[in-house]
Amino acid sequence: MTSLLVHTYPSLVKGILIKRYKRFFADIQLDNGELITAHCANTGPMTDVCVEGQPVYLSRSDNPKRKLAYTWEMIQLGETWVGVNTNLPNQVVKNALLQGVFPDLVKNETEVRSEVAYGQNNGSRIDFLLTHGDNSLTYIEVKNTTWNQGETALFPDTVTTRGQKHLQELMALLPAAEAIMLYFINRGDCYRFAPGDSKDTKYGQLLRQAVAKGVKVLPCRFQVTPTGIYYLGLAELQL
């Protein structure tokens, strides 16, 4: 399919990653030689992505209340830019839903809501709840995916009890509603998607169980560039 622009970055600042530490902080040397500390929104291990000495791009906020003006947006690995700002995928997916990028999901008179309470005693929040014109419901959970092995994107890159819980909750929605797990592949060099069994065996087992029960999996490919993010279509699902 033709790539579709789904997010435009503001003017970004280029630098080199010196180090990432305490999960939230990244020291960056800007192209002008200045050494700054940027906010890292990704609190996970960033397996094989957090490579010191690689080119990065940062966004800059003019909000005087922020302790760190810069946010780390992406890193270059080989010829590929990889998105590392985990605050973006849900925003991008919502815009894509509203723009009709996923026509099979958003039909006429579909209402799109974010962060809706659901699950046992409404103790969880689904990333997106779609209410269609016929009152049918579609629940969508989004997972950011940056770890790869060759041309295969993998999730998770560490043990995630939270992710396991999300799969169980999606299964519990069936058959009364449609349940979707959307993997946001935040790099353009992956054409396949598979569960990261070597990092979390139970998650892989639950994902296969969920698919067998009727949970739909959408491994969505995105190309990240210094100017914007493009939707490339679906990756091949390998279970």
From Swiss-Prot:
InterPro entries: SfsA, SfsA_C, SfsA_N. GO terms for molecular function: DNA binding. HAMAP family: SfsA. Belongs to the SfsA family. PANTHER family: SUGAR FERMENTATION STIMULATION PROTEIN A. This is Sugar fermentation stimulation protein homolog. The gene is sfsA.
